[in-house]
Design a protein with these regions (language model features):
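Hydrophobic membrane-insertion alpha-helices, especially the h-region
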Residues: 5-24
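Conserved protein-kinase catalytic-loop position immediately C-terminal to the HRD catalytic Asp
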Residues: 234-236
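C-lobe/activation-segment region of protein kinase-like
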Residues: 202-210, 223-229, 239-297
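N-terminal hydrophobic targeting signals that begin at the initiator methionine
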Residues: 1-3
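Conserved ATP-binding subdomain of kinase catalytic cores across diverse folds
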Residues: 20-229, 240-241
């Protein structure tokens, strides 16, 4: 009898371990996307309150959400989905395990007793404050510089909108937007592939305009008192038809001193150092335009 119970227990443990392993493989193949990561157990904080959408914003958001959004990428703090017509991206904040609904499932005891987990928890709350502040400020002060259409942080009951998400396995999810933290943004083209295409087609005037847009974007943010703490041009900046924008809106930090020309001019040069190197190595015909634009600040 005891032997049979031990065998059943062992088989149960083996089955659970196998299922957990299979689940982990599926999770990785699905772009590390899980619907659970979108829902937080945090209480609404007045610090993150944002105005209700205007009638114009409400209509624009509703029009954008009439289509499905397909899995695009997992960033440092968000999942991104692109619209069927490739005009929009919707990003959802990806909450750490201890901030999710049913947080005890992942680490039922360690966040209470493990010093390492306590440090991780403190770090996560600090990063959350940085990210949500950046989302809020991007919506309130930097819409032109970020292409943000609408931002929602705290749980609410007034949006009454849903969006259909499609993950990498083609599974579909209906998400109530009142319940999650999200940013609806214009979809932008990446900078370096665009430069490469224009240069190979010898559309040098358009390529020069791209360079101008990038420099003016960084300058505009500085003049409004914001700097980017993750200034990777190749993945975090993009191009719309008429301007460059910040694709990543989670690391834009308030810095009043950067408003001064003696501070923002060297900052712009530093931020575009990688661009200058690319021009030197790959697009030498465009280097003079870069130098002229930077020197005219």
């Amino acid at each position: 009898m005891v032997r049979r119970q031990l065998l059943l227990l062992g088989a149960g443990i083996l089955l659970i371990g196998t299922l957990a392993h299979v689940d982990r493989i599926f999770f990785k193949r699905n772009g590390s996307f899980s619907i659970r990561f979108l829902y937080s157990n945090l209480s609404p904080n007045p610090k993150w309150d944002l105005p209700k959408p205007t009638p114009e914003e409400d209509q624009r958001v509703s029009e954008a959400l009439r289509q499905k959004f397909y899995y695009l990428a997992k960033g440092t703090h968000c999942y991104a989905f692109q619209s069927e017509d490739n005009q929009y991206v919707i990003k959802f904040h990806r909450y750490p395990s201890h901030m999710r609904i049913f947080s005890w499932i992942n680490h039922p005891l360690s966040y209470r007793f493990s010093e390492r987990r306590k440090k991780i928890k403190a770090h996560n709350f600090k990063r959350l404050d940085v990210n949500l502040t950046s989302y809020r400020d991007s919506d309130q002060f930097l819409k032109d510089e970020t292409g943000v259409i609408f931002t929602h942080i705290n749980r609410t009951d007034h949006l009454r909108k849903k969006v259909t998400l499609v993950d990498k396995t083609k599974a579909e999810y209906q998400i109530s937007l009142d319940d999650v933290t999200f940013i609806l943004q214009k979809k932008a083209d990446l900078i370096y592939p665009t430069l490469d295409r224009l240069y190979s087609q010898r559309k040098l005037d358009e390529a020069k305009q791209v360079i101008t847009h990038i420099i003016l974007l960084i300058t505009s943010c500085c003049q409004k008192g914001f700097i980017d703490e993750d200034p990777v041009l190749k993945r975090n900046y993009g191009l719309l038809e008429d301007r460059a924008i910040h694709i990543d809106v989670g690391d834009l930090i308030k810095n009043e001193k950067i408003r001064l020309p003696e501070n923002y001019i060297p900052h712009v040069k530093e931020m575009t150092g990688d661009l200058r190197k690319q021009l030197e190595d790959l697009y030498p015909d465009l280097l003079e335009h870069y130098n002229e634009t930077v020197n005219s600040l």
